[in-house]
Amino acid sequence: MSKTHFGFETVEENEKAKKVAGVFHSVASNYDLMNDLMSAGLHRAWKAFTIAQANVRPGGKVLDIAAGTGDLTKAFAKAAGPTGEVWHTDINESMLRVGRDRLLDKGVVTPSLLCDAEKLPFPDNYFDVVTVAFGLRNMTHKDSALAEMRRVAKPGGRVMVLEFSKVWEPLKKAYDVYSFKVLPWLGDKFAKDADSYRYLAESIRMHPDQETLKTMMEQAGLDAVKYYNLSGGVVALHVGTKY
């Protein structure tokens, strides 16, 4: 059995999937709070930038992977309109349920599907835009997930990855203090779950940096891959096109 990382811990691949599932079952009901704590509220601006870059048109087909509470899904559904097709998907049943209920509460009726990004149940060449926000770093086989995202994108379609990344060097010390000291404390204080928040901080550090992820997307067959550093590299939006 192959080994992989769960935060800073080395575990069996099948064990990682179970541990990640446990984290997100635990944080699902407080996921928006978690995002606020992890990003100091900036996740809204990062998502708004991603939505603008996606430029979804009326009638567009969009796949939102690891869609969680549905922030991107909601915006894409509005942009695609009644003639569009926007899928809200997640591998975690708790996250999917919370997101589906919140979308319905906001009057957004769009399909929600429990699925694994490494084995997407969609045909080739189907979507105009495929997005994953703050989900890729939790996947065991990132290369497989990226290849699947490319597969289901139409020729000319785009794959977009919004993810925590490598912060600029002058900010690193302060960012480490926040990630490994402040964040678990906040997780314990507000969500009674310091361990899950500690894992999330560790998973960010183990995630590929901007240039490495760019290379991985190119190796998955995507072209014209570029990235935008946001908030000093705390987050990066990578965009690749399928030609």
Curated annotation (Swiss-Prot):
Coiled coil: which residue ranges? Answer: none
Which SUPFAM superfamilies did the record assign? S-adenosyl-L-methionine-dependent methyltransferases (SSF53335)
**Entry's EC annotation:** 2.1.1.163, 2.1.1.201
Catalyzed reactions = a 2-demethylmenaquinol + S-adenosyl-L-methionine = a menaquinol + S-adenosyl-L-homocysteine + H(+); a 2-methoxy-6-(all-trans-polyprenyl)benzene-1,4-diol + S-adenosyl-L-methionine = a 5-methoxy-2-methyl-3-(all-trans-polyprenyl)benzene-1,4-diol + S-adenosyl-L-homocysteine + H(+)
What pathway is this protein a component of?
A: Quinol/quinone metabolism; menaquinone biosynthesis; menaquinol from 1,4-dihydroxy-2-naphthoate: step 2/2; Cofactor biosynthesis; ubiquinone biosynthesis
Source taxon at top rank? Bacteria
Keyword annotations of the record: Menaquinone biosynthesis, Methyltransferase, S-adenosyl-L-methionine, Transferase, Ubiquinone biosynthesis
Enzyme class, broadest EC rank? transferase
One GO BP annotation here?
Answer: menaquinone biosynthetic process
Residues recorded as binding S-adenosyl-L-methionine, renumbered to this chain, are T69, D90, D116, A117
CDD domains given for it? AdoMet_MTases
Q: Name one GO molecular function term.
A: demethylmenaquinone methyltransferase activity
State the family it belongs to. Belongs to the class I-like SAM-binding methyltransferase superfamily. MenG/UbiE family.
The protein's role, per its UniProt record: Methyltransferase required for the conversion of demethylmenaquinol (DMKH2) to menaquinol (MKH2) and the conversion of 2-polyprenyl-6-methoxy-1,4-benzoquinol (DDMQH2) to 2-polyprenyl-3-methyl-6-methoxy-1,4-benzoquinol (DMQH2).
Fetch the HAMAP family from UniProt: MenG_UbiE_methyltr
Name used for this protein in its record: Ubiquinone/menaquinone biosynthesis C-methyltransferase UbiE
Species whose genome carries this gene: Burkholderia mallei (strain ATCC 23344)
Identify the gene encoding this protein: ubiE
